[in-house]
């Protein structure tokens, strides 16, 4: 204010007397006007910055909620089938018992002895389904083709129900890098034709993707059902491995299906992380699965080497999954039947659906990366 008064005095004309209304208006009023203007400008700047931050935070929060809502999308499991060299009982019951079925036995050529499990080659005579028996009799089918047929047969009624409602599933075959994709596609098309199914879109995806085809299917916003099939057959089986296969039929939650088609489980969006970020991946899978850490009592584990199980314990402690820090709460199917290659992760999903229970279950799969997903089994429909 003194600087404004000084400027008025310096600029006041010398030939005018320094008094009067104009003089005192400038001396007393101009500094106050300048002060009010500066305060108003400062306040306007503060308000604009405050509103900018407020709207930015509001937009960021809305965007975060949109991303969380998108991340929490899931696929329903409408059916599954698996083929494994089990002695008796279901796969989930066998793994839950914890008794290893692995045994040292010679390879098919008799060259050496390896601890592993093999699918029987002469089990076609035990087939009850006449349609499946007719398909298996076709000479153009390889071992992979016959396994695809055995996996597909239990799902035929569901696929027929989808076809009647005008919804056809897309078929995705999970194959290893050393398997020619053209051969796998040719075999599944022969099987589909032999079962007289409509022409289904069939593609091959890398077996090392593990559970992540669910993530890709959700990102693509597909409205079709998804039929995933994986087979693990060996000419020279690795130690601690098993032959087998799995097929699982998934569909988006938004897909309207006939009332007679009832889902048996839900798989939430899986998360893939490297080993040093595994804890973050487990935490994110809980968020995507809308599961509180205290509600998860069981985990199905596959693909982890013996020295990597410590990572599971560390990740569980960091995310509040105290119940899963003990081996008793983690079902390790590899120790019971051996590792099933690219089918292992999906066998864990079917085991969780088959085991049932009201609480969410955690799937931990070691493929190309470490993967985690939440599976919720649905209670059977009352008749």
Language-model segments: residues:
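Conserved "HGTGT" condensation-loop signature of ketosynthase/thiolase-family condensing enzymes
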Residues: 1-213, 217-220, 236-237, 246-383
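Short, well-structured beta-strand segments enriched in hydrophobic/aromatic residues
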Residues: 225-227
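Generic short beta-strand segments
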Residues: 229-234
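Carbohydrate-active enzyme catalytic cores, enriched for enzymes
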Residues: 241
């Amino acid at each position: 204010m003194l600087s404004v008064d000084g400027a008025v005095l310096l600029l006041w004309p010398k030939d005018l007397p320094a008094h009067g209304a104009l003089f005192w208006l400038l001396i007393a009023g101009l500094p106050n006007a300048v002060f009010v203007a500066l305060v108003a400008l400062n306040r306007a700047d503060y308000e604009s910055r405050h509103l900018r931050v407020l709207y930015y935070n509001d937009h960021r929060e809305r965007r975060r909620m949109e991303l969380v809502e998108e991340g929490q999308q899931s696929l329903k499991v409408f059916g599954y089938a698996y083929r494994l060299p089990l002695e008796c009982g279901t796969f989930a019951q066998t793994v839950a018992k914890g008794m290893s079925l692995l045994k040292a036995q010679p390879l098919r050529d008799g060259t050496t002895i390896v601890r592993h499990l093999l699918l029987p080659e002469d089990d076609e005579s035990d087939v009850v389904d006449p349609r499946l028996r007719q398909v298996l009799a076709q000479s153009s089918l390889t071992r992979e083709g016959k396994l695809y047929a055995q996996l597909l047969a239990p799902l035929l009624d569901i696929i027929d129900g989808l076809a009647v409602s005008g919804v056809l599933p897309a078929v995705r075959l999970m194959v290893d890098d050393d398997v020619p994709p053209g051969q796998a596609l040719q075999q599944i098309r022969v099987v589909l034709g032999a079962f007289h199914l409509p022409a289904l879109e069939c593609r091959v995806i890398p077996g090392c993707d593990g559970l992540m085809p669910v993530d890709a299917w959700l990102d693509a916003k597909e409205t079709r059902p998804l039929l995933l099939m994986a087979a693990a057959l060996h000419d020279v089986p690795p130690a601690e491995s098993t032959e087998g296969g799995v097929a699982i039929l998934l569909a988006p939650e938004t897909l309207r299906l006939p009332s007679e088609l009832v889902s048996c489980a839900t798989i939430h969006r899986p998360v893939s992380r490297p080993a040093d970020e595994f804890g973050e991946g487990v935490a994110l899978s809980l968020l995507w699965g809308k599961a509180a850490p205290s509600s998860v009592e069981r985990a199905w584990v596959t693909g982890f080497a013996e020295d990597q199980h410590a990572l599971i314990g560390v990740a569980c402690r960091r995310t509040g999954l105290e119940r899963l820090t003990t081996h008793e709460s983690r079902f390790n199917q590899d120790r019971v039947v051996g590792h099933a290659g690219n089918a292992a992760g999906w066998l864990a999903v079917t085991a969780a659906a088959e085991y049932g229970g009201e609480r969410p279950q955690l799937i931990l799969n070691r493929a190309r990366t470490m993967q985690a997903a939440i599976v919720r089994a649905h209670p059977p429909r009352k008749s």
